[in-house]
Design a protein with these regions (language model features):
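N-proximal low-complexity "stem/linker" segments adjacent to membrane-targeting elements
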Residues: 1-16
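Conserved catalytic core of nucleotide-sugar-dependent glycosyltransferases
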Residues: 88-149
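Short amphipathic alpha-helix
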Residues: 20-25, 57
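A glycosyltransferase accessory/donor-loop signature
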Residues: 39, 120-130, 137-251
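Active-site-proximal specificity loops/subdomain of glycosyltransferases
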Residues: 36-65
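Short, charged, surface-exposed secondary-structure boundary motifs
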Residues: 19, 44-47, 104-110
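GT-A fold catalytic core of metal-dependent nucleotide-sugar glycosyltransferases
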Residues: 54-108
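Short, acidic, metal-binding catalytic loop of nucleotide-sugar glycosyltransferases
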Residues: 24-32
Length: 251
């Protein structure tokens, strides 16, 4: 069976991030297959032509992936060390959505400020940024539900506790799909290594969402250090121009 990493990247900023992510993957896993899915590669075309945030296209990753087994990663991430052993842990599952995040100290985070929608609706704590799936009936059904959530968000929202102006995000759509299909079929909460360092303001105690303005960091060829701490888990840096520093460090 073929296996590889897939990165969804629509728009120049995300393509730049995806290229940096691909380079970081190949640096620590030289034999890894990596595919960047750009707008022209979407099997159903761009479903959000008038928006910068192309969340509505995410469900197309199932058909767009050229692999039998896929680990989908968000574009604005960095992989600091090999995660090739994940394949052995995940291979017996059809689908696993990450449910764990960490702060820059590498500690599992229990900050819930960004998860009010999840908590108010008793939904699984899904983080779409790292998702494993196998070409299977389970994964196909999952992404059909994700598509349905985006296309019929107003109907879903009418049954949920949320702000009337709440928009459908990929995490919300994944959480709903995980709930419908069952956590036992869609997540692996005990595999906490399948997690990311989430560089959001309140998770890391920074004054603003731009952590690069307040934290000291180093981008070295073999690691990224933040406040002198080496980052050992996938780093979701989210400040898009940080990709330039990653690219320069991996030349």
């Amino acid at each position: 069976m073929t296996k590889g990493f897939v990165i969804m990247a629509q728009g120049d900023d995300y393509v730049k991030c995806a290229e940096a992510l691909k380079r970081s993957i190949k640096f620590v896993m030289p034999d890894a297959n990596v595919t960047i899915i750009t707008t022209d590669m979407l099997p159903y075309g761009d479903q959000a032509p008038d928006t910068y945030w192309k969340l509505q296209n995410d469900w197309q990753v199932y058909e767009a992936s050229p692999y039998d087994e896929t680990i989908k990663l968000e574009a604005d991430m960095y992989i600091p060390r090999s995660i090739s052993h994940w394949w052995d842990v995940l291979k017996d599952r059809d689908l696993v959505v990450s449910s764990t995040i960490r702060n820059f100290k590498q500690e599992i985070s229990d900050v819930r400020l960004y998860r009010r929608f999840i908590d108010d609706n008793n939904l699984p704590d899904a983080y779409n940024a790292i998702t494993y799936f196998k070409k299977s009936d389970t994964a196909k059904r999952f992404y059909e539900i994700v598509r349905d959530v985006f296309e019929n968000w107003e109907d879903y929202k009418a049954t949920l506790k949320c702000n009337p102006q709440e928009i459908a995000t990929t995490d919300w759509a994944y959480a709903i799909a995980c709930h419908i299909m069952g956590v036992e079929n869609t997540m692996l909460p005990t595999f906490t290594e399948m997690s990311m360092v989430h560089m959001k303001q309140y998770i890391n105690g920074t004054p603003t969402e731009n952590w690069t303005d307040s934290f000291v960091y180093e981008c070295l060829p073999n690691q990224v250090r933040i406040q002198t701490i080496p980052q050992r888990y996938p780093l979701h840096y989210h400040v898009k121009n940080f990709s330039d520093k990653i690219m320069k460090s991996l030349i």
